[in-house]
Amino acid sequence: MSHRINKVAVLGSGTMGAQIAAHCANAGLEVLLLDIAPKELIAQEQARGLSLESKAVKNRIVNAGLEAAKKIKPAAFFSPRVAGLITTGIFDDDLEKVSGVDWIIEAIVEKLDIKRDLLARVELFRKAGTIVSSNTSGIPIKAMAEGMSDDFRKHFLGTHFFNPPRYLKLLEVIPTADTLPQVVAEIADLCDRRLGKGIVFAKDTPNFIANRIATFSSLNAVRVMIDGGYSIEEVDAMTGPVVGRPKSASFRTTDIVGLDTALYVAENLYAAVPDDERRDVLVPPDFMREMVKRGWTGNKAGQGFYKKQRGEGGKTEYLVLDYNSMEYKPAQKVRIPSLDAAKAIDDTVERIRTLVYGKDRVGEFLWKTISANLIYTSNRIPEIADDIVNIDNAVKWGFNHEFGTFELWDVIGVEKSVAKMREDGLEIPPLVQKLLDSGKKSFYEHREGRTFYFDVATGDYKEVEPRPGVTILKSIKEQTKVIKKNASASLIDLGDGVACLEFHSKMNAIGADTISMMNYSVKEVGENFEALVIGNQSENFSVGANIMMLLLGTGRRVGRDRHFGAAVSEREHESQVFGEACSRGASRHGAGRRLRDHDAWRQGSRLG
């Protein structure tokens, strides 16, 4: 469907604009990157005798944005060569070139009047039928298009990328009442298939889906922290990997985003939602406002909730803010018995259930924050989205959470949690009451490799539509298509003469069982299949060899170099044979199908 989009214009070369341009180039699209011209010369330009009319001066801002994207970590480009697909220019001289592109993406400063002025200029040169979108994180899409031509409004929508665009999977697509359905479908198809994004369809409401929920969630956690006398280190220890969230947890995430940015988003949201039943939570506490006044805005300022400095002997040491005294102190490792015990539980579901219903400080904090977030998010349907699937995907893909809001509700148990909410005097959302009144006990059901979600409109389960061309191994296995398995690996029949060797040991480390299944797969695929895919849908493809298990599996004694070398040599030979067999199968079959994880790209978490 998206075959006609081959050239893109990105308007704005700031952090987001330049990285969006980079990722479009990664997908093989030609990109025109434009920005404003400088109004003053810098010292170096004056020394060279340049003027404001010199091209080097005019393109200074846009070229600097592109150069920053080339150097940013993690890398915005697949390869340095890809940057050659990007051409730079300025609005005053080069805006007419948008007449030759297929998609125009606006990514300038978050001010409605400035965006509208630029889009009005774009309309002078844009050819009819060209798609135009805005990367705004919360300005109403409809307001930007007001007064534009009928053709412009029909081809205009929001496309909210999350930072960094290459790594965070989420793309919120926000149509208006005027946007043509085929335009929405074309952008969604392009961004899914070529840009690798996870598409969520949001309504044109303040901050859309992900940032609406995240703003409430983060500020509510701060409120619970203050009321309960928790430290910043304690909160981060309770809101990170132990509950299926990134290592950056709560406050390290805000340091990455920038506290000034986070408060700007919160203040705009507060002004835009006068009828929000929890609007009071959107008011940041005084200590956070004071941090911004002092310039303690996070990593970009060198200090925020955390501060890194050189200690004695040049050793790096980390400090953390005491929000009561507004002084930094050495960060302490958090030691809470229930947290330490929970870390020994491998299963995230069981770990969360254990912690959230705990009777200690950890349980109290997690219950108060999670229950409030569940209720708040449930009350946002149908305001911000029509179904729970789009909301859950926005939370997972935008912030790298293992579970979306309604998936998390299933994890802790709908009936059990609702009973506790009632004990606490909390009001149960109509959506949840409707679920329970219908006799259902969960928001999702899984049957024979298919996933169903509770549909608010019908009050019944509705199947989550499978994505064409995407294979989900869990679903395939639930359809009893496993040829053979052991504790570390499985051989799965994908259909069409293709088998898949999936690793599923702890962290997908390769041990004796994995190699045994490799050897079996070579023989089985050679006799009964056309091709073999080696893949899995875990966070790690493989962390490498489990040397201890490999050695034990060979029957050799551990600790002697000659035995170690012999074992490795033998395994290298087996791996070579295995690889050659896979190559033969792949060359016979061709490119094969897409094998991709819905929840991949867990590379950090930050607001878009």
Question: Predicted segment positions?
Answer:
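Conserved divalent-metal-coordinating catalytic cores
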Residues: 596
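N-terminal glycine-rich phosphate-binding loop for ADP-containing cofactors
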Residues: 2-539, 547-580, 587-591, 599-601, ...
